[in-house]
């Protein structure tokens, strides 16, 4: 899936679109995507001057965006202005290596389970053979204007 297909599936845009390409997609099971991290990322200006590091929350967001692509594919749906896919929880997030300009972040997501409209994913972000981040992510789809039931 190239960037043109990705922007049809995700509502995010620059500077918050954090998936550049999908390289593997196995329906109802897993996805592998890429985020090319460049020195032009706006967050590097302040995180950190002289030693730029991708913020961990943005690595988690990149994983969540890849999870959204997998979920929409599994449901056979194309998102529209009436439905949004929300990140609703993160468990066990661990950061094991910094992600720096020039790195290619590989985002690997597998579906763990779907129950009561909540999707649970296992996510792994890596650079080469090194794990940068791992986490369990929970997401759900809501219609715009639908009340929060939490």
UniProtKB/Swiss-Prot annotation:
It is found in: Cytoplasm. Transmembrane segments: none annotated. It is an enzyme of class 4 (lyase). Disulfide bonds: none annotated. Its EC number is 4.2.1.59. It comes from the Bacteria. One of its GO terms (molecular function) is (3R)-hydroxyacyl-[acyl-carrier-protein] dehydratase activity. It holds the Pfam family FabA. It catalyses: a (3R)-hydroxyacyl-[ACP] = a (2E)-enoyl-[ACP] + H2O. One of its GO terms (biological process) is lipid A biosynthetic process. Keywords: Cytoplasm, Lipid A biosynthesis, Lipid biosynthesis, Lipid metabolism, Lyase. The active site is at 47. SUPFAM superfamilies: Thioesterase/thiol ester dehydrase-isomerase. The keyword Lipid metabolism applies. GO terms for cellular component: cytoplasm; membrane. InterPro entries: FabA_FabZ (IPR013114), FabZ (IPR010084), HotDog_dom_sf (IPR029069). Involved in unsaturated fatty acids biosynthesis. Catalyzes the dehydration of short chain beta-hydroxyacyl-ACPs and long chain saturated and unsaturated beta-hydroxyacyl-ACPs. Belongs to the thioester dehydratase family. FabZ subfamily. HAMAP family: FabZ (MF_00406). This is 3-hydroxyacyl-[acyl-carrier-protein] dehydratase FabZ. It comes from Verminephrobacter eiseniae (strain EF01-2).
